[in-house]
């Protein structure tokens, strides 16, 4: 069992990487999972969980269910179970479940503990660590949420064996995102190694990167913005396709390529660096065909990104490999010219 400590100002917690241990709780626990994960992994968790009382709430699977209705269902289950401030919630699932349970636990009784048990690669390397929580709205993705750190995170690689290839590759996109912005050595490892032979090490390295970033910038005031590489465009893609055509990681892969196009046009990436990132995405089958339906509407959606300020879009753009820059005040004409390639 490997451990990563995340020491923050208000609380410390650990990420455990290895076989899911027995979890002993003296309080009530509400498990929230989705309709697919519950069938695959809920019995495994229930075997290892000892609590004062356990209840299970199952939400429909998919990004489009990360909404007010699902949030209300979670909270209603908590009220019916009479959870108190000493009780906790357990998120068993991917990024959607992690985000929703984190948010629900942050607002129930003004905040109770929750444990993250991520079952997808994307959730293990990204969504389950760092405390960003939220739900989607008709206006955009993750526009309502909070910062609420988990009590603990348990990552069992056995969960990943049940993932379809497409879901696994979507998680790799988030690893590439972190590598390109923060760690040139991880980029080289992904380029030269067979991921199957070093998966645990890559997950550990990715979580370590995110942990270091979160410790430095918990509330996303500066360096943590790098974790949003590909997300300004990616969230607009998800919204335009009604969260149905692409998995989150797939949309982020497209978003990274759009960001690379913009960085290349601004002289922040050389053609060699641009092609290097492109080839890495190709290696993991993360090149997708996508055409923007309405160029003007897509451009306007970019302003709904949470990083935008004073009617200015902020883009996270790679500055070479292993570094990034927050770019703003980019002329509309420059952005539109880049987007025309995708129209």
Swiss-Prot record:
Keywords: Amino-acid biosynthesis, Aromatic amino acid biosynthesis, Cobalt, Cytoplasm, Lyase, Metal-binding, NAD, Nucleotide-binding, Zinc. One of its GO terms (cellular component) is cytoplasm. Its main location: cytoplasm. Pfam families: DHQ_synthase (PF01761), DHQS_C (PF24621). InterPro entries: Dehydroquinate_synthase, DHQ_synth_AroB, DHQ_synth_fam, DHQS/DOIS_N, DHQS_C. Its EC number is 4.2.3.4. One of its GO terms (molecular function) is nucleotide binding. NAD(+) binds at residues 61-66, 95-96, 119-120, 132, 141-142, 159-162. The keyword Cell membrane does not apply. Its cofactor is NAD(+); Co(2+); Zn(2+). Binds 1 divalent metal cation per subunit. Can use either Co(2+) or Zn(2+). Pathway: Metabolic intermediate biosynthesis; chorismate biosynthesis; chorismate from D-erythrose 4-phosphate and phosphoenolpyruvate: step 2/7. It is an enzyme of class 4 (lyase). Zn(2+) binds at residues 174, 231, 248. One of its GO terms (biological process) is amino acid biosynthetic process. It catalyses: 7-phospho-2-dehydro-3-deoxy-D-arabino-heptonate = 3-dehydroquinate + phosphate. It is found in: Cytoplasm. It comes from the Bacteria. Catalyzes the conversion of 3-deoxy-D-arabino-heptulosonate 7-phosphate (DAHP) to dehydroquinate (DHQ). Homodimer. Belongs to the sugar phosphate cyclases superfamily. Dehydroquinate synthase family. PANTHER family: 3-DEHYDROQUINATE SYNTHASE (PTHR43622), 3-DEHYDROQUINATE SYNTHASE, CHLOROPLASTIC (PTHR43622:SF7). This is 3-dehydroquinate synthase. The lineage of its organism: Bacteria, Pseudomonadati, Campylobacterota, Epsilonproteobacteria, Campylobacterales.
């Amino acid at each position: 069992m490997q451990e990563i400590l995340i020491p923050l100002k208000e609380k410390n917690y650990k990420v455990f990487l290895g076989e899911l241990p027995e979890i002993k709780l003296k309080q009530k626990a509400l498990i929230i999972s989705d309709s697919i994960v519950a069938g695959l992994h809920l019995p495994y968790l229930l075997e290892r969980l000892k609590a004062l009382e356990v209840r299970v709430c199952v939400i429909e699977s998919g990004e489009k269910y990360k909404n007010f209705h699902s949030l209300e269902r979670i909270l209603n289950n908590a009220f019916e179970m009479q959870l108190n401030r000493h009780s906790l919630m357990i998120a068993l699932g991917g990024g959607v479940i992690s985000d929703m349970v984190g948010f629900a636990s942050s607002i129930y009784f003004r905040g109770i503990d929750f444990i993250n048990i991520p079952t997808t690669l994307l959730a293990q390397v990204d969504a389950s660590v760092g405390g960003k929580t939220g739900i989607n709205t008709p206006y955009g993705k993750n526009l309502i949420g909070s910062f609420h750190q988990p009590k603990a995170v348990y990552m069992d690689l056995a969960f990943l064996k049940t993932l379809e290839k497409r879901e696994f590759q979507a998680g790799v996109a988030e690893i590439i995102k972190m590598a390109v912005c923060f760690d040139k050595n991880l980029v080289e490892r992904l380029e030269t190694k067979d991921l199957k032979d070093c998966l645990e090490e890559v997950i550990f390295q990715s979580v370590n990167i995110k942990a270091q970033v979160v410790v430095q910038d918990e509330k996303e005031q500066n360096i943590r913005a790098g974790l949003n590489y590909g997300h300004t465009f990616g969230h607009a893609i998800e919204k335009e396709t009604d969260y149905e055509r692409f998995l989150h990681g797939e949309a982020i892969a497209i978003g990274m390529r759009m960001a690379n196009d913009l960085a290349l046009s601004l002289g922040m990436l050389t053609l060699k660096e641009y092609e290097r990132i492109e080839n890495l995405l190709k290696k993991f089958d993360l090149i997708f065909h996508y055409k923007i339906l309405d160029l003007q509407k897509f451009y306007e959606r970019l302003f709904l990104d949470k990083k935008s300020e004073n009617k200015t879009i902020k883009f996270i753009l790679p500055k070479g490999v292993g570094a990034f820059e927050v770019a703003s005040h980019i002329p509309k004409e420059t952005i539109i010219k880049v987007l025309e390639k995708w129209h």
